[in-house]
Design a protein with these regions (language model features):
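N-terminal accessory regions of nucleic-acid-interacting proteins
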Residues: 1-83
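Two-metal-ion RNase H-like nuclease active-site motif
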Residues: 84-94, 222
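Acidic, Mg2+-coordinating catalytic module of metal-dependent nucleases/exonucleases
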Residues: 185-223
Length: 223
Protein backbone atom coordinates (compact mmCIF):
# COMPACT_ATOMS: atom_id res chain seq x y z
CA UNK A 1 0.00 0.00 0.00
CA UNK A 2 2.86 2.38 0.70
CA UNK A 3 3.87 2.56 -2.96
CA UNK A 4 0.25 3.43 -3.80
CA UNK A 5 0.27 6.29 -1.31
CA UNK A 6 0.68 9.97 -2.09
CA UNK A 7 -0.81 11.37 1.11
CA UNK A 8 2.64 11.62 2.68
CA UNK A 9 3.68 14.19 0.06
CA UNK A 10 3.51 17.92 0.85
CA UNK A 11 0.22 19.44 -0.25
CA UNK A 12 -1.46 16.10 -0.97
CA UNK A 13 -4.48 15.13 1.11
CA UNK A 14 -6.94 12.26 0.82
CA UNK A 15 -9.01 14.12 -1.77
CA UNK A 16 -6.06 14.80 -4.06
CA UNK A 17 -4.72 11.30 -3.55
CA UNK A 18 -8.05 9.80 -4.63
CA UNK A 19 -8.13 12.13 -7.60
CA UNK A 20 -4.75 10.81 -8.69
CA UNK A 21 -5.97 7.23 -8.34
CA UNK A 22 -9.03 8.01 -10.47
CA UNK A 23 -6.80 9.26 -13.28
CA UNK A 24 -4.96 5.94 -13.27
CA UNK A 25 -1.98 7.14 -11.25
CA UNK A 26 -1.97 4.26 -8.78
CA UNK A 27 1.70 3.97 -7.84
CA UNK A 28 4.80 6.11 -7.47
CA UNK A 29 6.06 4.61 -10.72
CA UNK A 30 2.86 5.66 -12.48
CA UNK A 31 3.33 9.23 -11.29
CA UNK A 32 6.95 9.42 -12.38
CA UNK A 33 6.08 8.12 -15.84
CA UNK A 34 2.74 9.79 -16.38
CA UNK A 35 2.06 12.17 -19.23
CA UNK A 36 2.10 15.83 -18.29
CA UNK A 37 -1.32 16.81 -16.98
CA UNK A 38 -2.13 20.48 -16.63
CA UNK A 39 -3.90 19.90 -13.32
CA UNK A 40 -0.66 18.77 -11.69
CA UNK A 41 1.96 20.24 -14.00
CA UNK A 42 2.96 23.08 -11.67
CA UNK A 43 3.70 20.74 -8.81
CA UNK A 44 4.84 17.67 -10.72
CA UNK A 45 8.57 18.39 -10.60
CA UNK A 46 8.56 18.95 -6.83
CA UNK A 47 6.37 15.92 -6.17
CA UNK A 48 8.58 13.82 -8.44
CA UNK A 49 11.58 14.72 -6.31
CA UNK A 50 9.63 13.82 -3.17
CA UNK A 51 8.63 10.49 -4.69
CA UNK A 52 12.24 9.77 -5.63
CA UNK A 53 13.13 10.40 -1.99
CA UNK A 54 10.42 7.94 -0.95
CA UNK A 55 11.81 5.36 -3.36
CA UNK A 56 15.28 5.79 -1.91
CA UNK A 57 14.06 5.57 1.69
CA UNK A 58 12.03 2.46 0.87
CA UNK A 59 15.09 0.87 -0.71
CA UNK A 60 16.94 1.64 2.54
CA UNK A 61 14.04 0.03 4.48
CA UNK A 62 13.63 3.21 6.51
CA UNK A 63 10.25 2.60 8.14
CA UNK A 64 10.69 5.46 10.59
CA UNK A 65 11.00 7.97 7.75
CA UNK A 66 7.57 7.03 6.40
CA UNK A 67 6.06 6.85 9.88
CA UNK A 68 7.13 10.44 10.47
CA UNK A 69 5.67 11.81 7.21
CA UNK A 70 2.43 9.81 7.06
CA UNK A 71 -0.63 11.20 8.86
CA UNK A 72 -0.95 9.31 12.18
CA UNK A 73 -4.24 7.73 11.10
CA UNK A 74 -2.56 6.29 7.99
CA UNK A 75 0.40 4.47 9.58
CA UNK A 76 -1.25 1.15 8.68
CA UNK A 77 -0.02 1.76 5.13
CA UNK A 78 3.45 0.70 6.28
CA UNK A 79 2.38 -2.89 6.80
CA UNK A 80 2.65 -4.42 3.32
CA UNK A 81 6.19 -3.27 2.63
CA UNK A 82 7.48 -3.78 6.19
CA UNK A 83 5.47 -6.73 7.50
CA UNK A 84 8.61 -8.83 7.98
CA UNK A 85 10.03 -6.10 10.23
CA UNK A 86 6.96 -5.86 12.50
CA UNK A 87 6.86 -6.87 16.13
CA UNK A 88 3.42 -7.32 17.67
CA UNK A 89 3.46 -6.65 21.38
CA UNK A 90 1.25 -6.28 24.42
CA UNK A 91 2.08 -5.68 28.06
CA UNK A 92 0.38 -6.46 31.33
CA UNK A 93 0.96 -4.44 34.49
CA UNK A 94 0.14 -4.54 38.19
CA UNK A 95 -2.50 -1.86 37.65
CA UNK A 96 -0.43 1.12 38.76
CA UNK A 97 0.29 4.24 36.73
CA UNK A 98 3.52 5.02 34.88
CA UNK A 99 5.27 6.00 38.10
CA UNK A 100 3.91 3.64 40.76
CA UNK A 101 3.20 0.65 38.55
CA UNK A 102 5.38 -2.00 36.97
CA UNK A 103 5.23 -4.39 34.04
CA UNK A 104 4.36 -7.95 34.97
CA UNK A 105 4.59 -9.63 31.56
CA UNK A 106 5.21 -8.78 27.92
CA UNK A 107 4.16 -10.94 24.99
CA UNK A 108 5.57 -10.48 21.48
CA UNK A 109 5.12 -12.07 18.08
CA UNK A 110 7.47 -11.39 15.16
CA UNK A 111 5.48 -13.21 12.51
CA UNK A 112 7.15 -16.52 13.28
CA UNK A 113 7.68 -16.90 17.01
CA UNK A 114 5.86 -15.95 20.20
CA UNK A 115 8.02 -14.83 23.11
CA UNK A 116 7.07 -14.11 26.69
CA UNK A 117 8.93 -11.90 29.14
CA UNK A 118 8.12 -12.30 32.82
CA UNK A 119 9.03 -9.92 35.63
CA UNK A 120 11.60 -11.55 37.88
CA UNK A 121 12.69 -13.97 35.18
CA UNK A 122 13.63 -12.53 31.79
CA UNK A 123 11.83 -9.18 31.51
CA UNK A 124 15.05 -7.24 30.87
CA UNK A 125 15.72 -9.35 27.77
CA UNK A 126 12.86 -7.53 26.05
CA UNK A 127 14.87 -4.32 25.62
CA UNK A 128 17.64 -6.16 23.78
CA UNK A 129 15.17 -7.99 21.55
CA UNK A 130 12.84 -5.11 20.68
CA UNK A 131 15.50 -3.26 18.71
CA UNK A 132 15.67 -6.13 16.22
CA UNK A 133 12.39 -4.83 14.75
CA UNK A 134 11.53 -1.65 12.84
CA UNK A 135 7.80 -1.40 13.54
CA UNK A 136 5.84 -2.01 16.74
CA UNK A 137 2.25 -3.14 16.26
CA UNK A 138 0.00 -2.64 19.28
CA UNK A 139 -3.55 -1.97 20.38
CA UNK A 140 -3.63 1.41 22.14
CA UNK A 141 0.13 1.14 22.42
CA UNK A 142 0.82 4.74 21.51
CA UNK A 143 -1.14 5.87 24.55
CA UNK A 144 -0.32 3.08 27.00
CA UNK A 145 2.12 0.25 26.21
CA UNK A 146 4.92 2.24 24.61
CA UNK A 147 4.98 5.13 27.13
CA UNK A 148 4.80 2.60 29.98
CA UNK A 149 7.71 0.61 28.55
CA UNK A 150 9.79 3.74 27.99
CA UNK A 151 9.21 4.96 31.54
CA UNK A 152 9.73 1.55 33.15
CA UNK A 153 12.99 0.75 31.35
CA UNK A 154 14.13 4.38 31.03
CA UNK A 155 14.60 3.94 27.29
CA UNK A 156 13.33 5.64 24.14
CA UNK A 157 11.68 3.47 21.49
CA UNK A 158 12.04 5.34 18.21
CA UNK A 159 10.34 2.63 16.19
CA UNK A 160 7.61 3.29 13.68
CA UNK A 161 4.27 2.27 15.17
CA UNK A 162 0.99 0.86 13.93
CA UNK A 163 -1.67 1.26 16.60
CA UNK A 164 -4.56 -1.02 15.68
CA UNK A 165 -6.95 0.81 17.96
CA UNK A 166 -7.13 3.72 15.54
CA UNK A 167 -7.20 1.49 12.46
CA UNK A 168 -10.05 -0.63 13.83
CA UNK A 169 -11.97 2.44 14.98
CA UNK A 170 -11.86 3.83 11.43
CA UNK A 171 -13.47 0.56 10.31
CA UNK A 172 -16.24 0.78 12.91
CA UNK A 173 -14.80 -1.48 15.61
CA UNK A 174 -14.61 0.10 19.06
CA UNK A 175 -13.96 -0.85 22.66
CA UNK A 176 -10.98 -2.71 24.02
CA UNK A 177 -8.92 -5.26 22.14
CA UNK A 178 -10.87 -8.24 23.45
CA UNK A 179 -14.14 -6.51 22.47
CA UNK A 180 -12.83 -5.98 18.95
CA UNK A 181 -11.81 -9.63 18.77
CA UNK A 182 -15.37 -10.67 19.61
CA UNK A 183 -16.81 -8.29 17.03
CA UNK A 184 -14.51 -9.84 14.45
CA UNK A 185 -15.59 -13.35 15.42
CA UNK A 186 -12.34 -14.30 17.12
CA UNK A 187 -12.60 -16.48 20.21
CA UNK A 188 -10.18 -17.30 23.02
CA UNK A 189 -11.06 -20.74 24.32
CA UNK A 190 -10.69 -20.98 28.07
CA UNK A 191 -10.22 -17.24 28.55
CA UNK A 192 -13.84 -16.13 28.64
CA UNK A 193 -14.31 -13.60 31.40
CA UNK A 194 -10.62 -12.81 31.75
CA UNK A 195 -9.99 -9.07 31.54
CA UNK A 196 -7.36 -6.57 32.62
CA UNK A 197 -8.52 -6.59 36.23
CA UNK A 198 -8.43 -10.37 36.42
CA UNK A 199 -4.97 -10.30 34.83
CA UNK A 200 -3.77 -8.35 37.88
CA UNK A 201 -5.28 -11.04 40.13
CA UNK A 202 -3.52 -13.74 38.10
CA UNK A 203 -0.18 -12.02 38.56
CA UNK A 204 -0.70 -11.67 42.29
CA UNK A 205 -1.69 -15.32 42.52
CA UNK A 206 1.49 -16.30 40.70
CA UNK A 207 3.79 -13.89 42.53
CA UNK A 208 2.59 -14.41 46.09
CA UNK A 209 1.47 -18.04 45.91
CA UNK A 210 3.82 -19.44 43.24
CA UNK A 211 0.78 -20.56 41.25
CA UNK A 212 2.26 -21.58 37.90
CA UNK A 213 -1.18 -22.20 36.40
CA UNK A 214 -2.07 -18.58 37.10
CA UNK A 215 1.03 -17.44 35.20
CA UNK A 216 0.21 -19.68 32.25
CA UNK A 217 -3.31 -18.25 32.10
CA UNK A 218 -1.92 -14.72 32.32
CA UNK A 219 0.50 -15.35 29.46
CA UNK A 220 -2.27 -16.87 27.34
CA UNK A 221 -4.34 -13.75 27.97
CA UNK A 222 -1.37 -11.48 27.30
CA UNK A 223 -0.84 -12.81 23.80
Amino acid sequence: MLQNSFIQLPGVGLKKERSLWKTGVLTWKDFLHQNEQSKYQASKNKLSLDIETCNNRLFEEDATYFYNILPPSESWRLFKEFQDACLYLDIETNGGDYYSGFITTIATYDGNNIKYYVNGENLDDFINDVFDSKILVTYNGKSFDIPFIENYFNVKLNHAQIDLRHTLKSLGYGGGLKSCEKQLGLSRDGLEGVDGYFAIHLWNEYYYNANQNALETLLAYNI
